[in-house]
Amino acid sequence: MQRVILHCDMNNFYASVECMLNPELKNKPVAVCGSVEERHGIVLAKNYAAKAFGVSTGEAIWQAKQKCQDLVIVEPHYEQYIKFSKLAREIYGRYTDQIEPYGMDECWLDVTGSGCMGTGFEIADEIRRTVKFELGLTISAGVSFNKIFAKLGSDMKKPDAITCIEADSFREKIWCLPAADLLGVGRATEKILSGYGIHTIGELAATSDDFLKCRLGKNGLAIKKYANGLDDSPVMRSDYVSPVKSIGHGITTMQDLENNAEVWCVMLELVQEIRTKLRTHKKKAGGIAISIRNNELFTKEWQCRISIPTQSPTYLAKTAFSLFAKNYQWEHPIRSVTVRAINLFEEDCPIQYDLFTDVKSLDRQERLDAAIEQIRFRFGKDAIKNGVLFQKSKMPTERKVDLVMPTGMIG
């Protein structure tokens, strides 16, 4: 039996919620932006009126203002976005319990067993009309026989539209589209493909396995399967909890970081949050990954393994900083830093030590970190901290970016 998969994408979600809650913003160009003072002064979302002026997500506010002098800037209200995201999922739940979120504003739905409610298109259209009537928001929906093409369909027509991609006609409909439109083909992959003259989904579908594996590894074989409609990944049930794959924190600093000492201070603060999340999820880090974005907005990433899985923020910070110092060349000041704990192990997993492991030192450090955490829990996070953190910090006082990543359905 062929599956019927929907992908529902709430159009310009943040901006649409703001405009719905503030009717005076209707028909005005609106951009939801972070705090200018704390260097989150970029466009997080924009409505279609702003898009018509060329305003782009991710650009600085001053750049957006140059394109549209009448642009209305509003601050994000995340509690409202969470509320409306939940309300939308409650509507989806009227049709199936197989609902898999893909971010706050997107979901896959498997309605294969909901045939009594209509065809895939009919169900998608009813959901679209219900969300519009009950929530005042619009969605675009893709209807297909797998998750990859359902997602592609929801991107093809916006806003407030439905696109069907059928098994017997998908080649004619999507093989002419840019390869970058396919989920799993990011900017780096697109650049590699285009360098070899592979520009469309159809060209990707016809490329040899050996060539793709040589140039892109396992991901190359995966995206070729997607291009040929070969995706059998399931839509998870609404109550399914994905295993955690990595835990991290990232921050955009109030001022650019200009030396190793400033980066060290930032990493020390970030790993304290990571430690808390590791404890919450009962995990230990078996590796560290860092992502560094410079003031030219170019990002570099590195990762390494940790010989002994740990929750120690001190050990995590030292490992992250060592990785940074070894690789970053200081060609430009740094705008943002992200640290992630990867290769996670269960908290109570048995540990195999080698002959060269300083077990006493490691145990002493972990007990010290645990004592510090208890003091912070009882008296507040500023009750005790590293001496270098008492100097003037470039860390913003408000929002850090939590990165708790479940295992993905792709790859």
Predicted segments with their positions:
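Residues at or immediately flanking beta-strands
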Residues: 138-140, 289, 336-338
